[in-house]
Amino acid sequence: MEKRVEKRRIVLVPLPLLGHFTPMMQLGQALILKGFSIIVPQGEFNRVNSSQKFPGFQFITIPDSELEANGPVGSLTQLNKIMEASFKDCIRQLLKQQGNDIACIIYDEFMYFCGAVAEELKLPNFIFSTQTATHKVCCNVLSKLNAKKYLIDMEEHDVQNKVVENMHPLRYKDLPTATFGELEPFLELCRDVVNKRTASAVIINTVTCLESSSLTRLQQELQIPVYPLGPLHITDSSTGFTVLQEDRSCVEWLNKQKPRSVIYISLGSMVLMETKEMLEMAWGMLNSNQPFLWVIRPGSVSGSEGIESLPEEVSKMVLEKGYIVKWAPQIEVLGHPSVGGFWSHCGWNSTLESIVEGVPMICRPYQGEQMLNAIYLESVWRIGIQVGGELERGAVERAVKRLIVDKEGASMRERTLVLKEKLKASIRGGGSSCNALDELVKHLKTE
């Protein structure tokens, strides 16, 4: 009997956004340590900077057309349309070169054209979600809605506040639709994202202890294995990928601050802040009388390069009381003993990193999944304070004092430390995420 040849090459297809690219690379590193080799097809739109080091990764180029800016939904839809044919040609060429030695394709859930190509070429394929299981369940709920009826229903206050079935405390008005322009194109995107096609399983960068009910519901709805492998950034396989230049001078400044006194402010790699909001944030932080480390990314303030948009006297006080950088070594900062809280946009990567370092959060979400994460941080895990609506300095000051000075903040810190230990236990031998990774590897070897 002919011995079965074990396929060891895996094709990874990340979405070309930092918050999606980084965990996909961390997943790839985990699989490299399990004996697989990783191939990453990339076009001009998502080419990795050549200065970055990804040992064990093979990057290959696929031709693509120039994307037009049509907003987040339009750009994603366009990307999936224009990339399918060239990706298919790329995979066919790979199959010829590698002698069919391709174990599977693992693709970001928003790069769903890969699922169609894998189906046509009869290749095993797995969906990777860099967001929460709760977000994926919400996409399933949204995919079944009729846009016109939903908009009419949502005019009723009772409907807005109705809890989504088996999703307490999420209400229908909490479903992530508000920031994506017209509703129907967004619902159509949800339908494409939740269409599992021939996928063998779904891989999620989350942890069972954080989302057990959402994971159970997702498993029931999809009827294929769901592997929660998170937090990927703290597995032994993770190497702390970053594609932005970090300013480590802030660590020296942190060394001079009192324990748990500093508020770390970072709104991720994509959020755009208005000048007025920045001014209110600055005054609120100054009035709180707490030191702060503030990441102001170039281009993150509308019509300005950053702190220059503040009045001169305010800018001077900010530089005296706080420390400003363009980008920070976030995991190292969150793990520093002087950091007592994280003012965050509540992106999922930042949320996991904060919990792993035992740092409670002030939640200022801007769009989509961030809103869901903020609700869970405040109402389910009870380790966050949400600041909503139009930002004003008084709300900033109150939130900082609640977290750093009041007993409420101390209780949040205790709960965060409990979750920290649970998340770290999940990746150790016998932990839920460690077991899920082993099961995934076993699954990959049987495809």
Curated annotation (Swiss-Prot):
**One GO MF term, please?**
UDP-glycosyltransferase activity
- Full protein name: UDP-glycosyltransferase 76E3
SUPFAM superfamilies documented for this protein: UDP-Glycosyltransferase/glycogen phosphorylase
Q: For binding UDP-alpha-D-glucose, which residues are annotated in this chain's numbering?
A: 269, 328-330, 345-353, 367-370
Q: Which gene encodes it?
A: UGT76E3
The record's PANTHER family line, in alphabetical order, gives:
GLUCOSYL/GLUCURONOSYL TRANSFERASES, UDP-GLYCOSYLTRANSFERASE SUPERFAMILY PROTEIN-RELATED
The protein's Enzyme Commission number: 2.4.1.-
Q: Which Pfam families match?
A: UDPGT
Q: Is the Zinc-finger keyword given for this protein? A: no
Q: Supply the enzyme class, top level.
A: transferase
Q: Does the keyword Transferase apply?
A: yes
List the InterPro entries hit by this protein, alphabetically. Answer: UDP_glucos_trans
Keywords (A to Z) from UniProt: Glycosyltransferase, Transferase
Record family assignment:
Belongs to the UDP-glycosyltransferase family.
